[in-house]
């Protein structure tokens, strides 16, 4: 019985310290909305085993406020059509919030098939690795689930996840 009391007391102390130390200027920002944007492509030099993609999305209907995601990524043909949870591309993403602060992420994407209209279905998991301004030290993750018309470069879909902003 003493062990249970000791473990309970240690757990209570740990949780109190953890909650108090992160409460100042800390918070969780939920991301849940729609995205729309476009991409452009450039083939790899010989041998052409893939292509580079550059693009951007905009969104205005999340708790984060209006933002734009800018990205560049190499895409290897060997990964196209891979099953879910297999890396298709990785990239560094900068999301500019309304006041100009940014969030940096690392992305892993895959192409689990086609959308109902025949466009490419792309699912990307973004891990937040930091940021600037009020997002310095931010952590969290979000998922982009989108359809891409490869002929026009137009893309649209949804974004969902959380950003954990640490107190200073």
Q: Where would I find each of the regions flagged by the language model?
A:
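Bacterial N-terminal signal peptides that target proteins for export
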Residues: 2-11
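Beta-strand-enriched cores of mature, soluble protein domains
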Residues: 25-168
């Amino acid at each position: 019985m003493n062990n249970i009391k000791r473990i309970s007391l240690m757990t209570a102390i740990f949780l109190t310290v953890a909650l108090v130390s992160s409460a100042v200027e800390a918070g969780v920002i939920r991301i849940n909305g729609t995205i729309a944007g476009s991409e452009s492509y450039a083939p790899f030099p010989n041998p052409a085993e893939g292509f580079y993609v550059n693009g951007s999305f905009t969104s205005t209907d999340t708790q984060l406020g209006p933002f734009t995601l800018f990205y560049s990524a190499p895409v290897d043909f060997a990964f196209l059509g891979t099953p879910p949870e297999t890396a298709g591309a990785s990239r560094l993403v900068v999301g500019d919030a309304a006041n100009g602060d940014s969030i940096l992420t690392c992305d892993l994407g895959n192409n689990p098939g086609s959308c109902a209209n025949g466009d490419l279905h792309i699912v990307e998991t973004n891990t937040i690795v930091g940021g600037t301004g009020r997002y310095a030290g931010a952590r969290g993750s979000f998922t982009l689930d989108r359809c891409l018309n490869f002929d026009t470069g137009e893309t649209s879909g949804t974004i969902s996840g959380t950003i954990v902003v640490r107190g200073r």
